Amino acid sequence: MELNRMIDHTILKPEATEAAVQKIIDEAKEYNFFSVCINPCWVAFASEQLADTDVAVCTVIGFPLGANTPEVKAYEAADAIKNGANEVDMVINIGALKSQQYDYVRQDIQGVVDAAKGKALVKVIIETALLTDEEKVKACELAKEAGADFVKTSTGFSTGGAKVADIRLMRETVGPDMGVKASGGVHNAEEALAMIEAGATRIGASTGVAIVSGATGEGY
């Protein structure tokens, strides 16, 4: 297993400067991470530099609250892909899920899936820290029904990040063929490997260098 190729090297802080984003890009190239995960305004900047590498460009949609309209999320995804994104991590409408508006949630995801079809992978952030286990299961089922490629635990901006028990539950729900991304709170190789053992196929972290070099990092 190549741990570096399971990492989305992440910088999503609102105050991230060009220099900070550049550092993430440079580290991703040096360590051959799977992707950089950056805010949409940096997609073209990253895409130009990573075009001739194995590092993908991942961005976020409806982030971090998930409360945009479906139309805006679909447009945001299309715009990001036009700018060079290979993967889009969208946030579900958490309030709609909790209101049991399941058709709305499914259609919200479907709009992004349709915008990305044939062009980019779609990961669905369900924000596990805000959900009951039953809601986590339902969110994963809706993401799978809508044709998403991955389910993802967290934005890193809520009350908690990835937990091994949540990864296990998500993997059990979506089955063996869909991706599961653990994001938020993974700081070292031991934590990353625990997530992978539980069923994660991707790790989202700002601490990618620490994870692959055996250190413990601070951050998302």
From Swiss-Prot:
GO biological process: 2-deoxyribose 1-phosphate catabolic process; carbohydrate catabolic process; deoxyribonucleotide catabolic process
GO molecular function terms noted in the UniProt entry: deoxyribose-phosphate aldolase activity
Entry's EC annotation: 4.1.2.4
Keywords associated with the record: Cytoplasm, Lyase, Schiff base
Subcellular location, principal: cytoplasm
Biological or metabolic pathway of the protein: Carbohydrate degradation; 2-deoxy-D-ribose 1-phosphate degradation; D-glyceraldehyde 3-phosphate and acetaldehyde from 2-deoxy-alpha-D-ribose 1-phosphate: step 2/2
Superkingdom in the source lineage: Bacteria
One GO term describing the cellular component: cytoplasm
Compartment list: Cytoplasm
Transmembrane spans: none
Reactions this protein catalyses: 2-deoxy-D-ribose 5-phosphate = D-glyceraldehyde 3-phosphate + acetaldehyde
Active site: 89 (proton donor/acceptor), 152 (schiff-base intermediate with acetaldehyde), 181 (proton donor/acceptor)
PANTHER family: DEOXYRIBOSE-PHOSPHATE ALDOLASE (PTHR10889:SF1)
Function recorded in the entry: Catalyzes a reversible aldol reaction between acetaldehyde and D-glyceraldehyde 3-phosphate to generate 2-deoxy-D-ribose 5-phosphate.
Family the entry assigns: Belongs to the DeoC/FbaB aldolase family. DeoC type 1 subfamily.
Xref: NCBIfam families: deoC (TIGR00126)
Identification of the protein by name: Deoxyribose-phosphate aldolase
Gene designation: deoC
